[in-house]
Amino acid sequence: MGGETKVFTLAEVSQHNNAKDCWLVISGKVYDVTKFLDDHPGGDEVLLSATGKDATDDFEDVGHSSSARAMLDEYYVGDIDSATIPTKTKYTPPNQPHYNQDKTSEFVVKLLQFLVPLIILGVAFGIRFYTKQSSA
């Protein structure tokens, strides 16, 4: 690897996306893995599906061994222009009213504990009052 390191855009790397010409972007570096497709333990489809994008997460999620990481050096062809890689947008949930669900249900339980006995007492007095008037 003498001389200057070649810098590729993601568009350039994306053109190398088939079994006869397969390039990957992993950790800011570009690798030509065409010769490795047949030897890859996970099959060539795994590598081909990672073309045209930053495949760093795909590579890291598998948990490659240190020997697999060392193997990357022999397929290195240059670096990626990081400005050409789309930034990942972090998911932010929509704003919702702030209320505590636990406190709301706790309030309802206390309210029912107070109201149910009052309603029962009111019904009992109503029945007694009604039956007293009808017998008189």
Swiss-Prot record:
It is a single-pass membrane protein. The chain crosses the membrane at residues 107-127. InterPro entries: Cyt_B5-like_heme/steroid-bd, Cyt_B5-like_heme/steroid_sf, Cyt_B5_heme-BS, Cytochrome_b5. One of its GO terms (molecular function) is heme binding. Is highly expressed in developing seeds, moderately expressed in flowers, and is expressed at low levels in the leaf. Its main location: endoplasmic reticulum. GO terms for cellular component: endoplasmic reticulum membrane; intracellular membrane-bounded organelle; membrane. Residues 5-81 form the Cytochrome b5 heme-binding domain. Heme binds at residues 40, 64. Signal peptide: none annotated. It is found in: Endoplasmic reticulum membrane; Microsome membrane. Keywords: Electron transport, Endoplasmic reticulum, Heme, Iron, Membrane, Metal-binding, Microsome, Transmembrane, Transmembrane helix, Transport. PANTHER family: CYTOCHROME B5 (PTHR19359), CYTOCHROME B5 ISOFORM B (PTHR19359:SF129). Cytochrome b5 is a membrane bound hemoprotein which function as an electron carrier for several membrane bound oxygenases. May play a key role in the modification by desaturation of fatty acids in the endoplasmic reticulum, which in the developing seed is utilized for membrane synthesis and in the developmentally regulated production of large amounts of storage lipids. Belongs to the cytochrome b5 family. This is Cytochrome b5. It comes from Nicotiana tabacum (Common tobacco). The lineage of its organism: Eukaryota, Viridiplantae, Streptophyta, Embryophyta, Tracheophyta.
